[in-house]
Amino acid sequence: MNNLTVLRPHAEQAYAAELTALAATDLHPKPLNWNLSPRAVVTYLLGGTLEDGTEIEPKYYGDKRLVEVAIATLATDRALLLVGLPGTAKTWVSEHLAAAISGDSTLLVQGTAGLPEEALRYGWNYARLLAEGPSEAALTPSPVMLAMQTGKIARIEELTRIPSDVQDALITLLSEKTLPIPELNNEVQALPGFNVIATANDRDRGVNELS
């Protein structure tokens, strides 16, 4: 794909040179399946100059401590919830965290009031399901399921707009790190590196309170 024709490239595309330079000079310990160490992720978000002279552009102007706590939360295998008013860079930060850690910010679920549980778990290609019955070929994985299978970060936008019963399904996935597929008598067990970054709007309190 020619990025000159793309109105808004993904973070891992727009800042590919910076991510490559950070990975090449990153000698610090990395959690399993992380592309960069936590220290390098901080540098990617807040900016700095690498030992080889590469300038890293700041992606976030704000409290360094908040960024460090967010990254430490993910590094200790806990999901991250970014809460704030509209326009406070929650989505921007979540995208760049996923890009720096997993190299992929596209495993995204957009929360809405009508979001079904299948959007967090899996669905079916009904044409194949009717023709072949339940099979792996007929299964349509959600972004969260793909993140579990590949050890990457899934992003969930506007968590409080999602119905409470669907939120409950997410809690089970995060606590058990397993997604049962009873139709196939199978399950997906999350690989190391899997995690979730969710955002929530302060002004949506009362729409669907967090479970």
Identify what each model region corresponds to.
Residues 2-211:
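AAA+ P-loop NTPase catalytic core and its hallmark functional loops
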